[in-house]
């Protein structure tokens, strides 16, 4: 706003939990049956912060043209296979790093998924997840933001504070409030586990 012919910028800040999301994948029931055998199901190892989401005991080796990475499956089953890795890990696998929202998989690289009982080749589904914020409709109103809005998030207080831009807001009654960064982003800010950050408007 303007006051006495001077431009005054008002920056709104809201504190929110920040989590590091390491590499993982989501699979369909059909893919899981091929990888682990008919009749097998996902084993809940640990509940995650997002309601209904859990890390599984079962792991899959993701194979690219240049290398491979073994990672955990996150449950429950999804309608489509999706592999989420960091930009650094795209180089290890030898695939193009494509930054996308979860579920936006058209035109993304594929890979081979290898389990103890078989393997599946997918022609798309490997993404570097766009950094994002999960909010309920109530917290979105409280923070003054809306679904698909792009905001900034400030994290780190150990001499490596970083302000991340291009953070997309995702609003759903199924969510719990949290910012998700990948391991490259968390390492850049020197984050150690779950911490607090500030949404900057």
Give residue ranges: language-model regions.
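Short, Lys/Arg-enriched N-terminal segments with co-localized hydrophobic residues
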Residues: 1-11
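Generic structural signal for short, solvent-exposed loop/turn connectors between secondary structure elements
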Residues: 11-12, 140
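Generic N-terminal amphipathic, Lys/Arg-enriched alpha-helix
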Residues: 12-20
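Short beta-strand-centered segments at strand-helix junctions
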Residues: 17, 24-64, 71-116, 121-148, ...
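Amphipathic terminal alpha-helices
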Residues: 157-159
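Short coil-to-beta-strand transition motifs
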Residues: 161-163
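Short beta-strand-to-coil "C-cap" segments at the C-terminal boundary of structured domains/repeats
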Residues: 199-201
């Amino acid at each position: 706003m303007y006051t006495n012919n001077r431009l005054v910028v008002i920056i709104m800040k809201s504190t929110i939990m920040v989590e590091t999301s390491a590499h993982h994948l989501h699979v369909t029931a059909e893919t899981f049956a091929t990888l682990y055998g008919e009749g097998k199901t996902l084993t809940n190892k640990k509940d995650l912060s997002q309601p209904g989401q859990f890390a599984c005991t079962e792991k899959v080796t993701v194979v690219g043209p240049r290398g491979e990475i073994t990672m955990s499956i996150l449950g429950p089953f999804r309608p489509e296979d999706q592999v989420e890795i960091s930009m650094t890990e795209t180089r290890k696998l030898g695939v193009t790093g494509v930054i996308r929202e979860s579920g936006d998989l058209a035109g993304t690289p594929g890979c081979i998924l290898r389990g103890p009982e078989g393997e599946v080749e997918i022609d798309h589904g490997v993404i570097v997840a766009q950094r994002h914020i999960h909010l309920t409709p109530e917290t979105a109103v409280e923070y003054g933001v809306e679904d698909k809005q792009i905001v900034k998030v400030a994290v780190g207080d150990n001499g490596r504070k970083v302000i991340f831009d291009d953070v997309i807001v995702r609003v759903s009654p199924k969510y719990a409030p949290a910012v998700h960064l990948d391991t490259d982003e968390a390492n850049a800010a020197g984050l150690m586990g779950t911490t607090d950050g500030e949404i900057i408007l």
